[in-house]
Amino acid sequence: MAFRCFFDVDGVVLDFESSFIKVVGDYFKLEVPENYQPGNWFFSDLLTWEQVEEGWEYFLKSSDFENIPPLVDPERFNDIFGAYPVHFVTNIPPDCLERRQRNLEKVGYRFSSAHCAGLVQYDGHPGQTNAELIQDLLEDNEGFMFVDDHPDNCINVHENFPDAEVWLMSRAHNQDFNHPVIRRALHWDDIMKHPREV
């Protein structure tokens, strides 16, 4: 059976949180605790909603946006998943996608394509859910795996493809999520060492 791999970018293959917090912390002159981990998706234990919005706009324009370090060794990632088409999915404004692709290429990931999809919609950019994007890319009788750090994206894919291999990458902000079928990865090794029949 043919097989494809779909990976979220920020928080799964690139260390978005650390990069964003460093840039925004410097921008607002915040004293961010060492090894800070956000307690929720919107960093509300550190930032006001207005700071998140302003900081996000600043981050998008910064050079740091396209210099985010990897969360998994790209060489090892390529060795394990390089036999399959790899598609990266990111929920950023579509006009930033080219810069994100450059970032992924620069750190050494090999991939077939990168796309914008997810549950956050940006003004003037009608978006797709992850499941809709996957449906567009799959060919007949193909299996796939999907990895994301947001429970809602994992649920979206699982509900539309109940036989797919869906993983939630553990982060501080998703610790309360439990699901009988969606797998939780504590570390990349959980995904890399999982046996698959493809």
Regions found by a protein language model. Give the residues of each.
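Active-site neighborhood of HAD-like aspartate-dependent phosphohydrolases
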Residues: 1-54
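Short, acidic loop-to-helix structural element flanking the phosphoryl-transfer center
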Residues: 57-88, 92-101
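Short acidic-hydrophobic, aromatic-tinged amphipathic segments that line or gate anion-handling sites
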Residues: 114-115, 181-191
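Short amphipathic alpha-helix with an adjacent loop that forms part of the alpha/beta core around
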Residues: 131-139, 189-198
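Acidic, Mg2+-coordinating phosphoryl-transfer loop and its flanking beta/alpha structural elements
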Residues: 145-186
